[in-house]
Amino acid sequence: MAVELGFIVEGHCEYESIPSIVSKIHGYFNFPIINAKGIGNIIKNTSDELLHLVKHFDPRKIIISLDYREAEREGLVKDCVELKEIVLRNCEQFMQTQQNGSLELPDEICVIIADKTYESWICADYENLKTNPLFNAAKITENFTNVDEEIPNPCSWLQSKLNEDIDMKARANRKKVAQTLRPDFAATKSRSFRKFHKEVTNINVA
């Protein structure tokens, strides 16, 4: 049976966190989500990831969520625009290749680039991070208009606001941090998250 939405995400952080974020938007999360395990894999194997998702889950809409910092670091792209163009082109090729086949193809494929990394989206609800026991609220003194532009290194910013001896690489801690995010607030403080929020919200649930 077809589902209204499916996700392909870049790595473990997104795979573990996006269900929590989306469930706050829709009140539930029963959508398929694929961990592509690296930006290089998404760029090289977009068609394979799409084929798996379409073949097994038949989503009407697919959201591919990426960040460009790692792709830039690996020399795969020069900026987020190029990354989005490459992946969209791969998506178009997949649709063209499969259009005469037996698969029920999605109505829409959206590529959302987190600027600069997925952690930018976590930073976007800096106010609610103050209530998270992993963080030292006294260290979070800033007010932001657009964290995408105003926080150059989101991972370092988050690390600098933690309580002592907190390991952000621990899976349980990553989940706790993601659960803090309020989508409606984050959408006002991150332009890239606002795009994600819009695409997640704009689905046909009929």
Task: Locate the predicted segments by residue.
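A conditional alpha-helix N-cap/helix-loop micro-motif detector
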Residues: 43-44
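C-terminal accessory helical subdomains adjacent to catalytic cores in phosphodiester-
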Residues: 2, 15-35, 47-57, 61, ...
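Short polar catalytic/cofactor-binding loops
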Residues: 11-13
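Conserved beta-strand elements of the Class I
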Residues: 4-8
